């Protein structure tokens, strides 16, 4: 499904040249749970951002379902992100004044789906992560683990082929971290999950 071939990424700031990725190659299959481990500053998030189309690689190739991304234009990357990728971030990135349901629905607003269908899909996604009873709460009324579950529901509501999780348990206690990891393993039954930690 996803092939990373000799990907290189360098950040240049003035005279400073920082090589974040140097010839990285990986093959990732459907329905797989992959954890990428490494110390801070080792390029894990850069790799995740390249897989997710949030950042561009300098050389090498990212091959998606047998198709090279070397000639992708901005609209191709936009389509890839909107239809193929779900993102889960350590900081949740929830809108504090919106309900949990509205936060999840937001991921569907540019998809052209009717309001009723958006609501149904958002409710289903929240039920899938065990938050069906918390639809009308706001993020500040929830625990860290619950907010991460909302973020996972939001990432899943578009039914992406790939879920990317950037340190999803970094801000959680150990018991809640285990629960979130179990949820991500469950999610990997139906799609590729790539997590960095």
Describe every region a protein language model picked out.
Residues 2-197:
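ABC family nucleotide-binding domain
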């Amino acid at each position: 499904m996803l092939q990373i071939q000799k990907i290189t990424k360098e950040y240049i700031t003035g005279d400073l040249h920082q090589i974040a990725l140097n010839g990285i190659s990986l093959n990732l299959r459907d329905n797989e749970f992959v954890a990428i481990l490494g110390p801070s500053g080792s390029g894990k998030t850069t790799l995740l951002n390249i897989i997710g189309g949030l950042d561009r690689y300098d050389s090498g190739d990212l091959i998606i379902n047998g198709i090279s991304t070397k000639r992708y234009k901005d609209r191709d990357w936009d389509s890839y992100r909107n239809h193929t990728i779900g993102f889960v971030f350590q900081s949740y990135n929830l809108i504090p004044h919106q309900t949990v349901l509205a936060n999840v629905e937001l991921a569907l607003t540019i998809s052209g789906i009717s309001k009723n269908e958006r609501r149904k899909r958002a409710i289903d996604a929240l039920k899938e992560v065990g938050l069906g009873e918390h639809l009308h709460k706001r993020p500040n009324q929830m625990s860290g683990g619950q907010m991460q579950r909302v973020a996972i529901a939001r990432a899943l509501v578009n039914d992406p082929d790939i879920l990317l999780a950037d340190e999803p348990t970094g801000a959680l206690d150990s018991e809640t971290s285990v629960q979130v990891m179990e949820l991500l393993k469950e999610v990997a039954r139906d799609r590729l999950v790539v997590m960095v930690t």
